[in-house]
Amino acid sequence: MLSILKKLFGTANDRTVKKLFSEITKINSLEPAIQKLSDEELKNKTVEFKEKLKNGATLDDIVYEAFAVVREAAKRVCGMRHFDVQLIGGLILHRGMITEMRTGEGKTLVATLPAYLNALTGKGVHVVTVNDYLARRDSASMGKIYNFLGLSVGCIVGGMPDEVKRAAYNADITHATNNELGFDYLRDNMKYSLQERVLRPFNFAIIDEVDSILIDEARTPLVISGPVNDNAELYGKIDKIVRLLNASDFEKDEKLKTINLTETGITHIESLLSKESIIKPDTSLYDFENLTLVHYVNQALRAHNMFTVNVDYLVREGKVMIIDEFTGRVMEGRRYSEGLHQALEAKENVKIQNENQTLASITFQNYFRNYPKLSGMTGTAMTEAPELKDIYNLDVVAVPTHNKVTRLDLDDEIYGSKKEKYDAILKLIRDCYDRGQPILVGTISIEKSEELSSVLNKEKIPHKVLNAKFHEQEAFIIAQAGRFKAVTIATNMAGRGTDIMLGGNPEMLIEQLDKEHNYEAKIAEIKAQIAEEKKQVIEAGGLFVIGTERHESRRIDNQLRGRSGRQGDPGKTKFFLSLDDDLMRIFASDRISGVLRTLGLKDGEAIHHPMISRSLEKAQQKVEGHNYEMRKNLLRFDDVMNDQRKIIYEQRTEIIKSKDSHGFLNSTTEELAQKIVLTFMPVGSYREDWDIENLSVELHRVFSIKFDHNVVSKNDVTEEEITKIVIQMAHDIYKSKEEAYSSELMHNAVKYILLTTLDQVWKDHLYSLDHLRQGISLRAYGQKDPLSEYKREAFNLFEQMLNNLKELFIQTVYHFHIDLKNVQKEDVLLEYKKLQKNMRESREDPAFSKYNAGSSIETDLKPVVSRIDPKDRNPDDPTSWGRVSRNELCPCGSGKKYKYCHGANE
């Protein structure tokens, strides 16, 4: 019934596109008049548009004319005229939606339309790409159009100094990678001066390959961290011990990606640890004194049994480098969290780097939701449309192709074993190669690509391998994958963003030329060669894309198919599968193997059966659903931290902007003075119960006040009067500092102290949230909702952090005894630059991140070490208390706060 209605009325997407086509006629009707304009008149349109906006017009009032102007500018500058479907894509982007456009449909050119229009407001537009190469390429090629129309263009890539970045961000249109944008946001919120920041306020972002950034990388937080304790030696010792364990000593679950010691494994490892004198004889690994070792053992187990070299990571130049599971690229600068990276370094016998503590972090989910207006483009988004709407409130519109797709997608072939599958792939490659038909073979890992490469080498078939090991040549290799007799092996979607043109890409070949010798003649020769090869390739059937395995996501499979058949070119695609494939082995039905045998599958034979295809699709849907839930769950938890992050960053900015720091200082002084006095002189208590001795100690500790006991000896003195006296004494101390060093210098000093103190307590708070997050899933065993518990405890920790901030700030201000004349703005910036040298930027692994609640095997350890439920604490045994807040009542039962009792010496 539903299919009949769709045929009659069309889908919602069809109706949207039809409506947009009616708007395109308005743009096309303006073209004749725009074509008659001189270059100077066309450029002046930008000034005219800005004037209209200044006088109250909206972007929607000028959208059609602006698009017509960009189309004409592109034609004059680059020789490219926007097709009608590209204009539709531009309207979709301008309206804050995602446009799905097939590979080769010119998404880069489409982005110029909304980028130009929205840049007219002067607030800046960010065009976001997935790597530095694409950011440079697009800013250079499309920048010609913007410059012609009088707009400035910037490009952000890794390693740029701040002054260069600042100029690039101040441009009308800025091309940047998603990583650099996120890290610059975090870095800006760690600086001590507004002038040092590089970013402008958020306005509008257009994300290229939006599905890759907002979905594939959504679970991967951007993290800036600083070094902590050096435990390299211990990682090395534990690694040697874990190598001695037997298969029966642990059990792992590939679906959940978890690994745990068995009872026999615990006994075995305890004896090994004891022999190496790492734990005392007759003690357990889970005794309180040894609990920290559990973390090292678990990470070493993961490193040896859940991670494979050249699949999950590779070793290059003595470093362990992570391979992105979705693109097959090396993730430069990214390190696994929680000591896992150190465990891998120990496993591979390379130098073990120090662990790091988080100083700032954010996920792409929350970073990109900062933009008031967000849009994106990709070749594959419809399968993820519900998630994009649910999480980012972004609608997806699929735009029809300019030319009809003639590519032929052949049925999958399924074999009983990997060897049989490879034999079939080899046979097809040989056939295509002999006919000159170019082939792109997609694999899911470096290991698989090199495995296939060795098979082709034995058969003496020339080919190129594109994977994380050759990232630098990625764009060039993929661009030439459409040449006559070309055979290219690529991991996953490496090279995404670069079109495969039949016959080859002349521009990239021209870039390789020596400009000093016969340059023009060589260009003509290359163009003639490419034209001839294109004819040969079309006659051979176009690009043949071979998939060696199904990916967990149907979208990734569709991306691979989409490399063939661009702009109406001929082409074919085919997937080859075996029962040994990860997806089949882990997620598909266990009955498939039996069914194949029942159907009479023999060695070397392939089978096509609807049930197999359905089972595969169900397996993919199951994994997609599982990953969606994980991303959704991450967002629910991360929103808690995000709300707190926004408050802290807003407060930090207000502090930097403030011209008078005395307001916060005075109010906090009064608040703490009252709190301290009432702690030792409770309201309504008898004078003999007043603890004047400890009151004096605490006032000196916090305010540097030398409290005169004689003040209390007066019979009629009250707690309120004592509070007023203490506040006045504190003000007098501060006033004496102002007289000695001037109000301006004290203002700078107080502001600097407040900022550095805020940074310190925020860093400690992030650490506490990390520990809380890792163990929160265990609350489910107690019939409690982990998310509700996390929200409640995170709020309590946040309140505690604010209290700690006030106390540390006041304590530092009143105890300042250094030469305050030297605390200038320049010194503040110098301090930040010193900190910057030791900071590390990283991307945490999505599968084994601390944010992946439920899959982390430290969950047994961290809640015990960090916080203990008060009712489980033994008053007579401090080792059972866990971490105690300074402002909590001491667990010993004395009735005093912990900081005045057992925590007095901490």
Curated annotation (Swiss-Prot):
- Quickly give the catalysed reaction: ATP + H2O + cellular proteinSide 1 = ADP + phosphate + cellular proteinSide 2
Q: Keywords on this record? A: ATP-binding, Cell inner membrane, Cell membrane, Cytoplasm, Membrane, Metal-binding, Nucleotide-binding, Protein transport, Translocase, Translocation, Transport, Zinc
Q: Name one GO molecular function term.
A: ATP binding
Task: Provide the membrane topology annotation.
Answer: Peripheral membrane protein
Cell location? Cell inner membrane; Cytoplasm
Protein name, entry field:
Protein translocase subunit SecA
The entry's family comment says: Belongs to the SecA family.
One Pfam family this sequence matches:
SecA_DEAD
Gene symbol of the encoding locus: secA
Q: Where does Zn(2+) bind?
A: C890, C892, C901, H902
Name the species this protein comes from.
Answer: Rickettsia conorii (strain ATCC VR-613 / Malish 7)
Q: What's an example GO BP annotation here?
A: protein import
Concerning PROSITE patterns, the annotation shows: SECA (PS01312), SECA_MOTOR_DEAD (PS51196)
Positions of region (Disordered): 861-887
Q: What does this protein do?
A: Part of the Sec protein translocase complex. Interacts with the SecYEG preprotein conducting channel. Has a central role in coupling the hydrolysis of ATP to the transfer of proteins into and across the cell membrane, serving both as a receptor for the preprotein-SecB complex and as an ATP-driven molecular motor driving the stepwise translocation of polypeptide chains across the membrane.
Provide one Gene Ontology cellular component. Answer: cell envelope Sec protein transport complex
Cofactor binding summary note: May bind 1 zinc ion per subunit.
State its cofactor. Answer: Zn(2+)
